[in-house]
Amino acid sequence: MSVLINEKLHSRRLKWRWPLSRQVTLSIGTLAVLLTVWWTVAALQLISPLFLPPPQQVLAKLLTIAGPQGFMDATLWQHLAASLTRIVLALLAAVVIGIPVGIAMGLSPTVRGILDPVIELYRPVPPLAYLPLMVIWFGIGETSKILLIYLAIFAPVAMSALAGVKSAQQVRIRAAQSLGASRAQVLWFVILPGALPEILTGLRIGLGVGWSTLVAAELIAATRGLGFMVQSAGEFLATDVVLAVIAVIAIIAFLLELGLRALQRRLTPWHGEVQ
């Protein structure tokens, strides 16, 4: 009887597994350690609370600015909506223009010869270097910020589309042509599916660059947005607001990355696991 009980207990132990992967567990543990160190340093006042407020103060301030009181004549959600609107408009423009441009460059040596030097000339330059020029040409309104973010996203998207077209397997293209497929059918059913993983990877890279460019642009030329909140709070030495908004910026960037990874897994399941 005791042997049967021991076997059942042993089988239950074998069946139970830690629900999270090793990587996720390590990530959560790292964040927990960082928060513990932060809380300890703040509790012992090793650094002045003016420069490093405790986590609970930052959380309380985050809840405050998310409420009706807000910050700088707008709530956190209004600032967040302004930032997300800019990044979404710039991303849509980069997708609508960048992907066709990249595909055209991959299919036509003439188009590539015309556009490749232009993209390669401006691509290495940090996007913020163009900000003064954008402000001079378009003022400090929405156009300058959206155009700056668009420039940051466009190059990775276009070049990834170009790389995706170049990586299309010639065997599949010839097989489709031998079966009587037209050029449009080859493009739509062979080249585009083969290029899609590269295009989505370029979108992930471009969105990351665009998000950082957005926040930096709002630090300089904006009256609403997450970057504007950080800049304004820094001028008043409101460190708790600065840290709260930085946390929001990091969380939004993380969620955008997770969303694009999920989209990539769904649209390109044959490409293997997205890292």
PLM-predicted stretches and their roles:
Residues 160-205, 226:
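Short cytoplasmic-facing helical segments at TM-TM junctions of multi-pass membrane proteins
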Residues 44-92:
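Periplasmic/extracellular loop-to-transmembrane helix junction in inner-membrane transport proteins
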Residues 147, 151, 183-217, 244, ...:
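Transmembrane alpha-helices
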Residues 89-119:
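Transmembrane-helix boundary motif in ABC transporter permease subunits
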Residues 120-156, 163-164:
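Generic hydrophobic transmembrane alpha-helix motif, especially the helices
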Residues 227-262:
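Hydrophobic alpha-helical transmembrane segments of polytopic membrane proteins
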Residues 59, 73, 77, 81, ...:
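Alpha-helical membrane-protein architecture signal
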Residues 1-32, 258-275:
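Transmembrane alpha-helical segments of polytopic membrane transport and secretion proteins
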